[in-house]
């Protein structure tokens, strides 16, 4: 369960109600649509929740994350808390046997962390510069792990929970 699912359920509601939340999920393909590749049937898949319109200028340039008329599993369409979810074939990736469903459910926050890294630190050659991560929720912790994996050694973290700091210590950053 993502922290943003909680207010969608108990406070603010989703973008469009009623809707079944859950945007970080994985599963098994049990049915395919007419245009989908039948080889997806019964495959284990990870799901990307953003469904771009495919028509706007951003989509035509392949910049789907900038689509203004997008749909989103778990807030604009039923998501992963449902027993079954209708997901476009373009929004799934087949999982290797070595990846669990639980790990695959982290694909969306991993993509956010990688995107942040690429936006803030594009093509940096010097891995010795200082980097700070503000916030140690799931995405912040993933960002710390990815920065360390990319060779950054001087990583500063700002978090307010003991268990988050313990995770960072286990990653060898503090």
Give, region by region, the residue ranges found by the protein language model.
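Mid-domain Rossmann-like dinucleotide-binding core that forms the NAD(H)/NADP(H) cofactor-binding site
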Residues: 99-174
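Short Gly/Pro-enriched turn/cap motifs at secondary-structure boundaries
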Residues: 16-22, 73-77, 83
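Residue-level marker of beta-strand positions
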Residues: 1, 24, 43-44, 58, ...
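Local cysteine-cluster metal-coordination motifs and their immediate loop/turn environment
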Residues: 2-6, 51-69
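A structural motif shared across PLP-dependent enzymes of the aminotransferase-like
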Residues: 55-58, 76-86
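Glycine-rich beta-strand-centered segment in the early N-terminal region that forms part
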Residues: 10-57, 96-98
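Structured surface patches comprising rigid loops and adjacent beta-strands/short helices at the edges
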Residues: 86-94
């Amino acid at each position: 369960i993502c922290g943003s699912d909680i207010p969608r359920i108990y406070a603010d509601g989703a973008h469009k109600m009623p809707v079944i939340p859950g945007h970080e999920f994985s599963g098994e393909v049990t049915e395919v649509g007419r245009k989908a590749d039948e080889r997806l049937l019964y495959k284990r898949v990870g799901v990307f929740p953003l469904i771009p319109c495919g028509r706007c200028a951003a989509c035509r340039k392949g910049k789907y994350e900038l689509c203004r008329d997008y749909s989103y599993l778990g807030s604009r369409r039923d998501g992963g808390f449902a027993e079954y979810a209708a997901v476009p074939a373009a929004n799934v990736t087949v999982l290797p046997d070595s990846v669990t469903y639980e790990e695959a459910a982290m694909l969306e926050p991993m993509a956010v962390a990688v995107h942040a890294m690429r936006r803030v630190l594009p093509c940096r050659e010097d891995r010795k510069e200082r980097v700070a991560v503000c916030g140690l929720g799931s995405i912040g912790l993933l960002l710390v792990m990815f920065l360390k994996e990319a060779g950054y050694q001087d990583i500063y973290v700002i978090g307010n929970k003991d268990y988050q700091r313990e995770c960072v210590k286990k990653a060898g950053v503090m």
